[in-house]
Curated annotation (Swiss-Prot):
It comes from Mus musculus (Mouse). Residues 127-234 form the Glutaredoxin domain. InterPro entries: Glutaredoxin, GRXCR1, Thioredoxin-like_sf. Keywords: Cell projection, Cilium, Deafness, Hearing. The keyword Plastid does not apply. Belongs to the GRXCR1 family. Pfam families: Glutaredoxin, GRXCR1-2_C. PANTHER family: GLUTAREDOXIN DOMAIN-CONTAINING CYSTEINE-RICH PROTEIN 1 (PTHR46990:SF1). This is Glutaredoxin domain-containing cysteine-rich protein 1. It is found in: Cell projection, Stereocilium; Cell projection, Microvillus; Cell projection, Kinocilium. The gene is Grxcr1. Transmembrane segments: none annotated.
Length: 290
């Protein structure tokens, strides 16, 4: 009797469940077998290139031809899964391919973010710098209303009374009420290589000096000659709203510096501050010209 030769399991041909082929070349890209093993890729490099080409096709051709040898019911389910996956990849994969470089990184302009940050930082510095042209025919005095150092407070009062006696219009910037005035004074004194010692007077945008300089110029008559082009005030009076300080409590937070979005029921907005006032909870007075 003839004995039938049995082939080992590894030599038996496996049944192919379905195949995926390229729509351009017709080459088989992937095969899935019925035994549940991982699909074998015939050519991974060619498969990736063909897959990208299929995603970027503008005429809406199908990306793969699915063939099945048996089990028609399972074939229909597999076809639906493959078509759904292909459609989703086509919807989102085209954008990904367009913005990705060969190395897989997102394309962009080199140092674009850092250059933009430097540009905006320089722009804010330029806008914050007081211009001498804007202070033409104007007197600006930097003072303080704090009496911690009595000598400084008395010198500020002396300079203020000197300009009030000349009946000229001047702008007083109290650094105790607004911290931005202090930063502005430091920047302007740094440009003229002078120490910011209160009070400081600027006429026509140029640094004039402190209390001693103003007092000596007033006694010699030089100050009166500089004030000939400055606008005169015939009847000086204090603003009834702010009392001549130029600032009022914030109308939004009433001086508490708390944001309107904060409440007593949650601590999620604890760090929010009012954006309508400064660090002291004050706003510029709108009824006076201080």
């Amino acid at each position: 009797m003839l004995r039938r030769e049995t082939k080992p399991e590894s030599d038996r041909p496996r049944k192919v469940r379905f195949r995926i082929a390229s729509s351009h070349s017709g080459r088989v890209l992937k095969e899935v077998y019925e035994d549940g093993q991982a699909p074998g890729s015939l050519d991974s490099e060619c498969a990736s290139i063909c897959a990208i080409d299929g995603l970027s096709d503008s005429e809406g051709q199908q990306n793969g031809h699915i063939g099945s040898e048996d089990n028609e019911q399972e074939k229909d389910q597999d076809n639906l899964l493959v078509l759904a996956r292909t459609a989703s990849e086509k919807a989102f994969g085209t954008r990904r391919v367009n913005i990705l470089s060969k190395n897989g990184t997102v394309r962009g302009v080199k140092y674009k973010v850092s250059a933009g940050q430097a540009l905006f930082n320089n722009l804010t510095k330029v806008l914050q710098q007081p211009s001498a042209d804007l202070e033409f025919d104007r007197v600006v005095i930097y003072t303080t209303c704090l009496r911690v150092v009595r000598t400084t407070f008395e010198r500020c009062e002396l300079v203020r009374k000197i300009f009030q006696n000349h009946r000229v219009k001047f702008e007083e910037k109290n650094i105790a009420l607004n911290g931005d005035y202090g930063k502005e004074l430091d920047e302007r004194c740094r440009r003229v290589s002078e120490a910011p010692s209160l009070p400081v007077v600027f006429i026509d945008g140029h640094y004039l000096g402190g209390a001693e300089k103003i007092l000596s110029m007033n006694e010699s008559g030089e100050l009166q000659d500089l004030l000939t082009k400055i606008e005169r005030v015939q009847h000086p009076h204090e603003c009834p709203s702010c009392g001549g300080f130029g600032f009022l409590p914030c109308s939004v937070c009433h001086g508490s510096k708390m944001s309107v979005f904060r409440n007593c029921f949650t601590d999620a907005f604890k760090a929010l501050k009012c954006t309508a006032c400064n660090e002291n909870g004050l706003q510029r007075c709108k009824n006076c010209t201080c």
